[in-house]
Amino acid sequence: MIFRFGFVSNAMSLWDASPAKTLTFARYSKLSKTERKEALLTVTKANLRNTMRTLHYIIGHGIPLYRFSSSIVPLATHPDVMWDFVTPFQKEFREIGELVKTHQLRTSFHPNQFTLFTSPKESVTKNAVTDMAYHYRMLEAMGIADRSVINIHIGGAYGNKDTATAQFHQNIKQLPQEIKERMTLENDDKTYTTEETLQVCEQEDVPFVFDFHHFYANPDDHADLNVALPRMIKTWERIGLQPKVHLSSPKSEQAIRSHADYVDANFLLPLLERFRQWGTNIDFMIEAKQKDKALLRLMDELSSIRGVKRIGGGALQWKS
């Protein structure tokens, strides 16, 4: 049984390598027309360059999973900007995709919490569709739309979770089918539990990303993992990818929802051990604040366990 690991967006070990450098609309608005275009191009070029740097870093370290930054392109979905970001950077996007395919990396996006489909407001749903389309367009430009996913949360409850869930099923119809086919859903730490998210995933035929930290932090989440996890595994069969789990540990007992800098191996071990009974290869995305540093430290700690063999910078053969 193989466990593979990855991290989110920015390699902390690299100098000045953020792939999420920003250009605010306030700053953009103060520029001339020529300066505006130049600023958009400059920031996007820097973010694409740092994405490439990060990919080379994870390839060199044998890390097989990576989550792209959602902020590669500044103001891509702002209604007063919404510019063509693909044409000027066709070469860069294509090179990123070739790296991903050549080294068989598993990649994903995770739009922010405002990209949701439970709102009764049409404008919120319209913005969600626009944001999902932006992420999908980047995957298309990279040539990896058929092998990556875009992960979101179900959304808010708006005072009535049953009504909001029904709203989700209605609103998601506005999402183009090719984008929905690459969408995944994740349980959250306050509102939608493991069971509730699983039910939506099963009804919509969408893969379920299980977040162990959210399960732990959500006071209403009482799922029997011996029942829920096999169902989670099954939701991934349609797209042919290994099941995916998000990992982090609480910052403290007082701040259980906050992500710690590193991952507490003892916090995760019960979950990792639980997967042994199904013998399924699992992919894990590390969401700790120290990102790649947290991943590499966790690999050192887990590989020291009797019966566990490290087979890559971010891969373990788990004990049978």
Curated annotation (Swiss-Prot):
A molecular function annotated in GO for this UniProt entry is: endonuclease activity
Its EC number is 3.-.-.-
Instruction: Output the SUPFAM superfamilies linked to this UniProt entry.
Output: Xylose isomerase-like (SSF51658)
The record's disulfide annotation reads: none
Q: Identify the keywords attached in UniProt to this record, alphabetized.
A: DNA damage, DNA excision, DNA repair, Endonuclease, Hydrolase, Nuclease
Q: Does the keyword NADP apply?
A: no
Keyword Nuclease in annotation: yes
* GO BP terms: nucleotide-excision repair; pyrimidine dimer repair; response to UV
Task of the protein: Component in a DNA repair pathway. Removal of UV LIGHT damaged nucleotides. Recognizes pyrimidine dimers and cleave a phosphodiester bond immediately 5' to the lesion.
NCBIfam families hit by this protein = uvde
- Write out the similarity annotation: Belongs to the uve1/UvsE family.
Q: What is this protein identified as?
A: UV DNA damage endonuclease
| Organism of this sequence | Bacillus subtilis (strain 168)
